[in-house]
Amino acid sequence: MATRKDIAREAGVSQGTVSNVLNGRGNVSSEKIRLVESAAAKLGYTINERARILRKGSSNILSVILPNLTFPQYEQFYNSFQKYAESRNYRTYLYTTDDNATREKEIISRLRSDMVAGIAAVSCLSDAPESYSKGGIRENEVLFVERSASSSCHYIGFDYAQAGRYFGRMAAASGPVRLGIVTDILPHSNELAFCQAFTETLREDQRKNLCTIQVTYSRRHHQILQALQSGVPESFYLASFSYASTLKDILANFYPECSPAIHTPSPLFTMPEQHFDKYELNYALLGQEAARMLLENLDSQSWKPRQVLLNADGRRDWTVSVPNGTGHPDKLNLLLLTSPETLAIQSLAKLYTQQTGIRIECTLRSYDEIYSMLSQPESLRNFDIIRLDVTFLSWFADRILTPLEEMDPSIRDVMAQYASGIADNYSSFNGHLYALPFSPSVQILCYRKDLFENTMLKRIYQEQYRATLEPPVTFKDFHQIAAFFTRANNPASPVTYGASLTLGRKSVAASEFMTRYRASSLRLHNADGKLDLNEEIGRQALEQLIDLKPYVHQPTYSWWSDTAAGFSAGEEAMTIIYSNYAQTLVKPSSKVLGKIGVALVPGQNPLLGGGSLGIPRGSVHPQEALRFLRWLCSEPVSSATALLNGIATCQDTYDNMDIQNSYPWMKVVRDSFSKVTDLRPPLRHAEPFNERQFLNIIGATTQEAYQGKLTPEEAIAEVRNEIRRKMD
């Protein structure tokens, strides 16, 4: 087996240089990095992980000990724990016990030889603290999860007694029904807390008639079937969601004539699930926070025990509140944009129909067709809800939409649920609430994380520009990095182009210009509320676009979907796209899957895209339309929508670990919305602003300047003339 000494001899460098290269340190010249990497590849060198740990004196390995990985709550926990650990440059080892004490003690005996730095354990041991201590594990190195071992140990979990009381109050109000409760024969602390709180909350007569079924994991099917021989209770309460799933299957197969309600704490379900009445606990969040807490304990060497209880999501309500009486319509007609967001509405609307009997019918039109229809209000008379692009809202709101507060004065209360920067930009004009955000999007910078972190490329960039290779904060940096990664300019680049541009249509060309303009100016209107494009900043924005020509694919992309597809093909180092098109980057066919970094756009003042849903003045069923809007645009439906289309509105949705794991750019999207400054005039000059017309003027001249038909100075003069002629 080749050694570092062999590599040093082959490459003609010192062993210290080899060590620096293999450990990813950036203090070696690009030429020596190339020599070492070539020699290592030629000799077939592989890193001896155990030897490296011994040299370092500590490892970057965390172990997770779980009962199993078949229960969905543990799968959610582990995936989230692993993701957080990897983001901090730690690896994870997974061990499963099947709740077998002997097996867990065998695992403990191996932990030191496996050289783990810390352990997160859902332990089945009654003497867990003592067992881990005997295994040479110090108190700050182990974090007990879900099942509390002792008040003298580090612990994180949920308030399981609170869940028990919640279901106990529900049962106490249910009347004289026979209740069943299913728990482990030797319940762990979480189940014990749930069961005690549940039974203490029941009425005396219910406690006397409570059917208690005790099971073990390995024999749960047999034990539940045996207990049901004496009759099936009308309502079941279970401390374990996995046992609830087992009970459901047994009832469906062996007692199809019975349909008892099944109530249980459960992991969080982003998509609707209708088999159980659930009290949801966010195990994905538990995984993240457990990893964070364990690493904090390791860093601080803290011996003072911490006991952390996370808040529960509780019962997330998917139901629709429909007033009693008749007069409800058979259907609601929606005018929507032909786009992926429509699939989410069509899918989730089926739940609304199941509960209310009201069908949701969708008419799909293009961006330009919807604008044309909005310009002719009589064409909207058959629609109850319409989709408006964010650039349409100011121009059309008070002409064609019904102010929502006229129908329901409390509607403004729902604005508090939206993430910062979304509510006002997608809902309001001139102090009135006209729409609810449904599909907001914002510009984000996507870059090849694998290239930006490549030791060789970082060193070459440092040598060439005397700067660190990192995501660009300014467009000057963006241009420099684009040049560096363009192979025609730098033969060492692994990709063909450093960046991309989307200029094929007027509206998208305007976005490319405005992103650069707004990086230097937050103001688009003067003190009198009139459009006032700064000539110098505008000229610089056009010059930046023109100067980027050698470093982008030609011809430039026509639409954002083309831009996303181009980046996912793997031949570009950076791209700026709207967040609603980022799904393309994580498709199975994407060549950049797992290699993507996301950041704020240069200048940190992105543009908005996407749109809202409002109720036209001619709607025949405005109250029912508003009821549907409130249901569709609020939690938990909002999170289900986001899981389907990658577009989030509510703050709770951005905090949803399921969605964060599916769409890794969500945190940057939320931050981007909070940075946006409005294109519309200041509120004191709140007159309708035809943003689409303005962007078309900008886009047309941007295209001409890029094609060389106008100089930047001529193009900006043309823009100012067109604005005066058409918009003043």
Where do the language-model regions lie?
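Glycine-centered hinge/linker elements that transmit conformational signals in sensory
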Residues: 479-484, 516, 520-558
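Flexible loop/turn connectors
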Residues: 230-239, 245-323, 329
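Extracytoplasmic/periplasmic substrate-recognition and gating elements
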Residues: 588-655, 678-687, 700, 713, ...
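Hinge/lid segment of periplasmic solute-binding proteins
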Residues: 390-444, 476, 595-599
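Flexible loop/hinge segments that line or gate small-molecule binding clefts
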Residues: 122-166, 264-276
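N-terminal helix-turn-helix/winged-helix DNA-binding helices
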Residues: 1-2, 41-79, 88, 113
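N-terminal helix-turn-helix DNA-binding module of bacterial transcription factors
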Residues: 1-58
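C-terminal capping/gating helix-and-loop segments adjacent to ligand/active sites or protein-protein/ligand interfaces
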Residues: 557, 654, 667-723, 727
